[in-house]
Amino acid sequence: MSEMTPREIVSELDKHIIGQDNAKRSVAIALRNRWRRMQLNEELRHEVTPKNILMIGPTGVGKTEIARRLAKLANAPFIKVEATKFTEVGYVGKEVDSIIRDLTDAAVKMVRVQAIEKNRYRAEELAEERILDVLIPPAKNNWGQTEQQQEPSAARQAFRKKLREGQLDDKEIEIDLAAAPMGVEIMAPPGMEEMTSQLQSMFQNLGGQKQKARKLKIKDAMKLLIEEEAAKLVNPEELKQDAIDAVEQHGIVFIDEIDKICKRGESSGPDVSREGVQRDLLPLVEGCTVSTKHGMVKTDHILFIASGAFQIAKPSDLIPELQGRLPIRVELQALTTSDFERILTEPNASITVQYKALMATEGVNIEFTDSGIKRIAEAAWQVNESTENIGARRLHTVLERLMEEISYDASDLSGQNITIDADYVSKRLDALVADEDLSRFIL
């Protein structure tokens, strides 16, 4: 897991997300507390439970982006789910237990990649030997068995040197590789995904591991052989246990759109996709044991981060038991014009940088001036105020409209320099922004 300090985590998030310092600090502290807990003795470690977080804020202010970036920083099993995809147990739809199953699958993949990387050097050696065995077959005795030579022959050493220097990369060889498993696609109704995956793995394992001769260039064969040899060096049982430990001790679940499962007013009949889902989430967040195809997983120390816009519902509309299990509340602020200006310029891969790079592929040099950036930000904020406030996503809409003409004619503008200043922006957007009916449908 990540050993970054809260300050370092916030600094990394600052490269991609503008503002929302309180939310960044909360997730940074929560992530660091995962590391701190692992430094305690076993008895005390078991007693320290994660403090789950509820992020509240209008759409388009960075809630989901914080989750995306956190996933890359955490170096721990992480999954992001939409609360609206689930229904109460016993009804058509996904059960909330599938969150932990998917998290465990993600952990197995992550641990497998780490194990393969750890064994990569040994796998490269074994792959090299297999290619050399094809180029220079080892000597055999009278009974057709391969003789174990004490010292590699001079010819083998010469070929090894050429292989490492890349002189043989384009030479074709025929080599035996593991055949792809039997492809079986099973369609199942919603909620039966676990049974489907078990049936698929059963069919794929039928017939054992078969070898298939393939003709490949040496550089391509080397890549496939390294993967094959690395996979052989990994112990599947150890891998599963390591993955389950990683989920139980370091797992993070991000539940988006949790406000959409709040109960709205008085309704008759079962509320299977709202309050029913909240009730099913309770044992997961509180701590229970979930059965997965890799083994039993305890959820006592998994960190849950929930987020929602809460424009119609309020956090108090969640059932009280779930509110109590999300003790840390973070409110994200609506974005201002100055925030929009910073979003257009400060992130490592800001929207303006992306558009400049896209147009550069056609030989068109785009330059955004400070006045142009300011006018784009003002236009986006103005449309948000007069219609629906969709936060930073409005910048994509405004910029796409602004760049439409250049994008269409880019192939004819090769070699030209185009400056986008306040006048350029006003000329193309002012009429749309001023007309509320037009901006409602176009911007």
Swiss-Prot record:
SUPFAM superfamilies: P-loop containing nucleoside triphosphate hydrolases. Gene3D superfamilies: 1.10.8.60, DNA helicase RuvA subunit, C-terminal domain, P-loop containing nucleotide triphosphate hydrolases. The gene is hslU. ATPase subunit of a proteasome-like degradation complex; this subunit has chaperone activity. The binding of ATP and its subsequent hydrolysis by HslU are essential for unfolding of protein substrates subsequently hydrolyzed by HslV. HslU recognizes the N-terminal part of its protein substrates and unfolds these before they are guided to HslV for hydrolysis. The keyword Mitochondrion does not apply. Disulfide bonds: none annotated. InterPro entries: AAA+_ATPase (IPR003593), ATP-dep_Clp_protease_ClpX (IPR050052), ATPase_AAA_core (IPR003959), Clp_ATPase_C (IPR019489), HslU (IPR004491), P-loop_NTPase (IPR027417). A double ring-shaped homohexamer of HslV is capped on each side by a ring-shaped HslU homohexamer. The assembly of the HslU/HslV complex is dependent on binding of ATP. Keywords: ATP-binding, Chaperone, Cytoplasm, Nucleotide-binding, Stress response. This is ATP-dependent protease ATPase subunit HslU. ATP binds at residues 18, 60-65, 256, 321, 393. One of its GO terms (cellular component) is HslUV protease complex. One of its GO terms (molecular function) is peptidase activity. One of its GO terms (biological process) is proteolysis involved in protein catabolic process. Belongs to the ClpX chaperone family. HslU subfamily. Pfam families: AAA, AAA_2. It is found in: Cytoplasm. Induction: By heat shock.
